[in-house]
């Protein structure tokens, strides 16, 4: 039977009703990135989402990059992986750039042969406690433990400086501050006069028995729940001063 109705639909000249799809051609969900007026004014439709966010000084995603970065042929640093202290790679030592540095050499006093090379990095791994040098403890093998505090502070300052230098970010921060102030000044909802009269009738008839108020079909025709009536009574009593 259903097949006959389908054949009638196919023969009919009436246009088919098509629902408006909220997805792109590749099947991904369409995201409204222009919800904010400041971002919409500074948005470049010729660039991708990541490129626009990078140009505006914003972060398109909070997670660390996992690959798929765009290779620019004009970039002189292309093909050379720089060490980033905050991207936890499998081996931090493998991505460090080799730079000329000074180090101490321990020689045999008799033959003059080099016995040991003391790198500056090894010196920073030791901490002096009560006159004795101890190796830095890292029982959990935290990769961030290898990153110095000065590197983390410089990275944080660099990220903060780049974000504040953008006019778009400053405008967004001002907008967020104004919205936060408006939210603080917003007054809570006040009970109307008819609502207060309704609560007075409920209390006059049932006292503190909220379950009886819920089951009263005359005074509670809208079937307000027990929790809803309890919240309304609490606000009503706080206003009257008899909590």
Curated annotation (Swiss-Prot):
Q: Where in the cell is it found?
A: Nucleus, Nucleolus
Provide the assembly information: Component of the pre-66S ribosomal particle.
Keyword Cell inner membrane in record? no
Q: Which domain of life is it from?
A: Eukaryota
Query: Mainly resides where?
Result: nucleus
Keywords recorded for this protein, A-Z: Nucleus, Ribonucleoprotein, Ribosome biogenesis, rRNA processing
Known function: Involved in the biogenesis of the 60S ribosomal subunit.
Region: Disordered; residue ranges are 1-22, 60-82
Q: Which GO terms describe its cellular component?
A: nucleolus; ribonucleoprotein complex
Q: Which Pfam families match?
A: Nop16
Give the Basic and acidic residues compositional bias ranges. Answer: 71-82
Asked if the keyword Nucleotidyltransferase belongs to this entry, the reply reads no
The identity of this protein, by name, is Nucleolar protein 16
Task: Record the organism.
Answer: Ajellomyces capsulatus (strain NAm1 / WU24)
Q: Which InterPro entries match?
A: Ribosome_biogenesis_Nop16
Gene Ontology terms: biological process: ribosomal large subunit biogenesis; rRNA processing
Family membership noted in the UniProt record: Belongs to the NOP16 family.
Taxonomic classification = Eukaryota, Fungi, Dikarya, Ascomycota, Pezizomycotina
């Amino acid at each position: 039977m259903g097949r006959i109705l389908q054949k009638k639909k196919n023969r009919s000249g009436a246009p088919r009703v098509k629902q408006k799809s909220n997805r792109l051609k590749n099947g991904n969900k369409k995201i409204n990135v222009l919800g904010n007026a400041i971002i919409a004014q500074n948005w470049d439709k010729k660039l991708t989402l990541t490129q626009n966010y990078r140009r505006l000084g914003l972060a398109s995603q909070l997670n660390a990059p996992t690959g798929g970065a765009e290779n620019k042929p004009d970039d002189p640093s292309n093909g050379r992986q720089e060490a980033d202290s905050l991207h936890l790679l499998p081996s931090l030592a493998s991505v460090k750039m080799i730079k000329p540095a000074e180090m101490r050499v321990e020689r045999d006093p008799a033959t003059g042969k080099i016995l040991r090379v003391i790198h500056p990095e090894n010196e920073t791994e030791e901490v002096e406690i009560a006159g004795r040098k101890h190796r830095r403890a890292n029982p959990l093998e935290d990769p961030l433990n290898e990153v110095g505090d000065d590197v983390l502070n410089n990275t944080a300052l660099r990220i903060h400086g780049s974000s504040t230098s953008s006019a778009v970010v400053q405008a967004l921060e001002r907008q967020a501050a104004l919205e936060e102030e408006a939210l603080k000044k917003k007054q809570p909802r006040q009970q109307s006069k008819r609502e207060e009269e309704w609560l007075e009738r409920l209390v006059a008839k049932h006292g503190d028995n909220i379950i009886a108020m819920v089951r009263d079909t005359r005074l509670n025709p809208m079937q307000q729940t027990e929790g809803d009536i309890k919240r309304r009574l609490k606000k009503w009593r706080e206003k009257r001063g008899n909590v």
